[in-house]
Design a protein with these regions (language model features):
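Glycine-rich active-site loop/strand segments that organize a redox cofactor
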Residues: 49-100
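An anion/pyrophosphate-binding glycine-rich loop and adjacent beta-alpha core
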Residues: 38-40, 46, 54, 58-61, ...
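A conserved FAD-binding loop/helix module that cradles the flavin
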Residues: 162, 166-180, 384-412
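Short hydrophobic core segments
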Residues: 7-9, 34, 137, 156-169, ...
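A conserved short coil-to-beta-strand element within the FAD-binding core of flavoproteins
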Residues: 133-146
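N-terminal Rossmann-like FAD-binding beta1-loop-alpha1 element of flavoenzymes
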Residues: 4-33, 403-408
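Glycine-rich FAD pyrophosphate-binding loop
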Residues: 23-49
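A glycine-rich dinucleotide-binding beta-alpha-beta segment and adjacent secondary-structure elements
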Residues: 133, 305-385
């Protein structure tokens, strides 16, 4: 099988995996990765706080797709071809040792994203893939059966037989796709924290509780509920449970200018009557103790003092003087603590958007465009997003791998060595 000139626009996880899969499937393909920035795989580097949440330990495609607020249905078949188990096997076959943490997240044993980056760069280099940084694509047009790609500060356009667009959430990537006939679902942020304008809460920054049950309530929308850990920050609330809610509610939150109500059940293992009973028992059995310093529940002391203060219980008040009204208010706060969401905060570690190329315009058997022959897609440029970084990286690995196979299929064009040097250098 003769090779083709393959241009991969985007040097992130999806672009690299697509390029590697393509070059592996047909070693004669002349594959070039064009990265607009100064460094390759920059988002992989910051994933998981610099440790790189490679994937998630979920090997059943039917369960895996439930972690994708958008794109799960389209990914169902894709995950039957390349899923987290395949990702783990791929990296381990190349000497990268991985570990699975208690919450299912998979990291390199080194706890260093550089391990993953080095593996990908070394594999690409070994396969002869050309890696170009500071190669921002300004224009892409199709002339006959070829793509002419204009790169910044390069006088002549690059020519490719096939193109993989793996530009992540870059607006330029969306523009290129639209110019070639694709519909772009307007992108909005996903995976972000909630700004809560409550100085008393913010004073308790760093406090975390697990598990809680959190419910997001928005106007004219069904409530969304998630269970997991929550974290108090300098600007409000974060943690896995908040990030999951931000992902599932991304579009509705954007439409409502990131205003809504978050209701937190701090004791999901107890019913409201059980909480009331525990408080009443304290009033009976420890009447002389100060309420603020004696918490009958497995909660951080600083959280307990937040709620006793919030419902108007003085710091020195003893259990003997707890009124029925105060008891009911405190129980309600622990069972249904309510916070007004005043906006969204940043979550720079895993900044993700929902939106992108409409999925109905992509053939997920090959990741080929249904609008422009020879064009392929992978990664976050598509209208796909997961609830945490590991799920987003897995969709990048999966769509990149399938796109690489698709790019390599039917490679019948011939390219001379001289021509390849002229057009792809």
């Amino acid at each position: 099988m003769a090779g083709q000139r393959i241009l991969v626009i985007g040097g992130g996880a999806a672009g690299f995996f697509g390029a590697i899969a393509c070059a592996t499937a047909n070693s004669r393909n002349l594959v070039t990765i064009l990265e607009a920035g100064a460094t390759l795989l920059s988002k992989v580097r910051i994933s998981g706080g610099g440790r790189c949440n490679v994937t998630h330990h979920c090997f059943d495609p039917a369960l895996l797709v439930q972690h994708y607020p958008r794109g799960g249905k389209a990914l169902r078949g894709a995950f039957s071809r390349f899923q987290p188990q395949d990702t783990i096997a791929w990296f381990e076959a190349r000497g990268v040792k991985l570990k699975t943490e208690a919450d299912g997240r998979v990291f390199p044993v080194s706890d260093d994203s550089g391990t993953i980056i080095d593996c990908l760069v070394q594999e690409a280099t070994a396969l002869g893939i050309r890696l170009r940084t500071r190669a921002a694509v300004k224009e892409m047009v199709k002339v006959g059966n070829e793509f002419q790609v204009t790169v910044a500060q390069q006088p002549q356009p690059l020519v490719g037989d096939r193109v993989l667009l793996a530009t992540g959430s870059s607006s330029q990537g969306y523009r290129l796709a639209a110019q070639l006939g694709h519909t772009i679902i307007p992108p909005v942020p996903s995976l972000f924290t909630f700004h809560i304008d409550d100085p008393l809460l913010q004073e308790r920054s760093g406090l975390s509780v697990e598990p809680v049950e959190a419910t997001l309530k928005l106007l004219q929308q069904p409530p969304l509920t998630q269970t997991g850990a929550i974290l108090v920050t300098h600007w409000g609330l974060s943690g896995p449970v908040v990030l999951k809610l931000s992902a599932w509610g991304a579009r509705a939150l954007a439409a409502q200018n990131y205003r809504g109500t978050l209701v937190v059940n701090w004791l999901p293992h107890l019913s409201l009557p059980q909480i009331q009973g525990e408080l009443a028992a304290c009033r009976s059995h420890t009447p002389k103790r100060a309420i603020a310093s004696h918490c009958p529940f497995p909660l951080p002391r600083r959280l307990w003092s937040y709620w006793t203060t919030s419902v108007g219980i003085p710091a020195e008040q003893t259990w003997a003087h707890l009124s029925k009204k105060q008891l009911l208010a405190l129980a309600e706060a622990l069972h249904r603590g309510t916070f007004a969401i005043a906006g969204k905060g940043a979550f720079k570690e895993e900044f993700v958007t929902c939106g992108g190329v409409a999925l109905k315009e992509v053939d997920f058997r090959t990741m080929a465009s249904r609008c422009c022959e020879g064009l392929f897609f992978a990664g976050e440029v598509l209208d796909i997003d997961g609830v945490t970084g590991g799920f987003n990286l897995q969709s990048a690995w999966t769509t990149g791998w399938i796109a690489g196979q698709g790019l390599a299929e039917g490679s019948t064009g011939t390219v001379s060595a001289g021509a390849s040097t002229a057009t792809l250098s």
